[in-house]
Amino acid sequence: LTLLLIGIIRLILPAALINPGDYVLMTTPGYPVFGTHAKYYGGLVHEMPLLERKRFLPDLKAVPAEVLERAKVMVLNYPNNPTGASATPEFFEKVVAFAKEHRLVVIHDAAYAALIFRGQPLSFLSTPGAMDVGLELHSASKMFNMTGWRCGFVVGNPLLVKAYGDVKDNTDSGQFLAIQHAVAEGLENPSFTKRIVSKYSRRMTGLVRLLKGLGFKARKPGGSFFLYTASPRAAVSADGSRVEFPTAEAASQWLITEKLISTVPWDDAGAYLRFSVTFAASSVAEEKEVLEEIERRLSDVKFEF
């Protein structure tokens, strides 16, 4: 079953699913809104860290038994924000088995599913048994560069979609029809998204190259428009002056105040910075200029990691 939605699904779903005392299993770092709203309804959040050595996939076996006894929902997001990591069919198979064993609802936030640089998009619902336990959320905002227009759809287990729809019917009155027509046009013309993916892939390749040249251990992700890389511990200027970064937050603040380069810091599961390739540039030449400017601003210091 599929239901069209506007951009408030993560706010509505907790109202449909969470009772006081229920646990939500959330990945960290990650987009926290579902967990935040679950708390409004008396829910609790258990964080599952995403570690580089585990390919930024959560360790399901590490969830404590006392949490699983009260767990109701597990929220996943692949390709992942902020890590850019992609899930595998084998991982999703483990998720389905885990959800059935512990009677969990799986919400897979697939906002970036179409933005992949290799292979074909992977839907959680393509996993055998996933329709028994899950929902998948899709975002036209990311798929067609329609951020701010707030349109997408939810698909999955009919009972879960109905539960969402019952709350949604009393929450909003639907999206502006012209935006719905625009989304339909995009869905009927996948070449739109292919061009967007090609642009992001090209920019990501350039960003990875320049950051590696500056000492970052940057690697091109499997998808999304985010580049997640270990934060530097210090920056040393040509005159020998040194700035220490005890946290990713400190490094991010230095980058924006001293170099006018915006990043998002994460200190939840190691110190990392999230770069993005959504900068404004209307041509390949302008993209090159932006990347060269980033390199110029950072080339007068040596980063230590």
Segment roles from a protein language model:
Residues L1-F305:
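PLP-dependent class I/II
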